[in-house]
Amino acid sequence: MLDISIQELIKQWQKYLILQKNYSNNTVIAYNNDLKHFLEFMNYYNSELVTLNHIKTADIRLIRSWLAKRKCENFTASSIARGLSTVKNFYKFLEKTLLLNNHIIFSIKSPKKAKLLPKGLSVDDVLISLEHIEEYGNVKWVELRNKALIVLIYAAGLRISEALSITKLHLQNLEFIKIIGKGSKERIIPWLPLTKNLITKYLEILPYKLDENEPIFRGRQGKKLQPSVFNRELIKLKRIYGLPEYLTAHSFRHSFASHLLEYGADLRSIQELLGHKSLSTTQKYTQTSIKHLEAVYNTAYPIKK
């Protein structure tokens, strides 16, 4: 249980994340779940209703006990690190709005995350997906929507949240699309004729009237399409055609980067297209490319035979 004043603070924090920090709804939901888990543990730890004073006086033992509990509950290192980052974010908000300081929180280092390489699809997997995704919509406009979404993500390297935020206003420029990504970072991506043609065909048969600033990708009931709904369409696809288990909407973004690198694009350009703040994030794809080259070498290099 939480004190009513704490509940109100959490609502203000969520508004701050959306309006000031430009976080996506999915990110805010994840952050809210992390904070809820932390405050529930604080409630258990102190054996009483959490108040602002409990938050202000939280010590290093409490934080470390909470992190240990998450580890015991089989949270991944990445999830544990994100949880701590969420708590720090909340405390920064309190420091800014209430002048509430708790520097102990910021002294705790995040657990080391396993460095997982991004998993992209092969070109063949992408082509199979494009060829067969239209078989699972049952309604023509849904089938076209699914295909247009895959092409958009793969051809432009968009995050699923970015793709699902595309409006008719984005279609007005014939040469490029302007994306506002994480942290309000703006990037410009060229339109491919195939992408725009598919989206245009989809909009021509979409049974719902949309304003120019409304997201164009809609669910069957006319509401904004949710990532989970689209990923369910992909689950059907990969089960029937034996596609990789890691095939998701986001895997097409990874494939965009990996395939550009394999075909000679430079890292800086890929960084700009993906909207990565740091080049080190983009450099993960060089490891993926090296793995690909090693596989080709091991199976095809004539001297090895």
UniProtKB/Swiss-Prot annotation:
Cell division keyword on record: yes
Domain Tyr recombinase: 116-298
Cross-referenced Pfam families: Phage_int_SAM_1, Phage_integrase
Subcellular compartments: Cytoplasm
Cell division keyword on record: yes
SUPFAM superfamilies associated with the record: DNA breaking-rejoining enzymes (SSF56349)
Single biological process term from Gene Ontology: chromosome segregation
GO molecular function, one term: tyrosine-based site-specific recombinase activity
Record GO cellular component, one term: cytoplasm
Core-binding (CB) domain ranges (all copies): 4-95
Keywords: Cell cycle, Cell division, Chromosome partition, Cytoplasm, DNA integration, DNA recombination, DNA-binding
Summary of subunit composition and partner proteins: Forms a cyclic heterotetrameric complex composed of two molecules of XerC and two molecules of XerD.
Physiological role: Site-specific tyrosine recombinase, which acts by catalyzing the cutting and rejoining of the recombining DNA molecules. The XerC-XerD complex is essential to convert dimers of the bacterial chromosome into monomers to permit their segregation at cell division. It also contributes to the segregational stability of plasmids.
The family this protein is said to belong to: Belongs to the 'phage' integrase family. XerC subfamily.
Record's protein name: Tyrosine recombinase XerC
Protein species of origin: Rickettsia prowazekii (strain Madrid E)
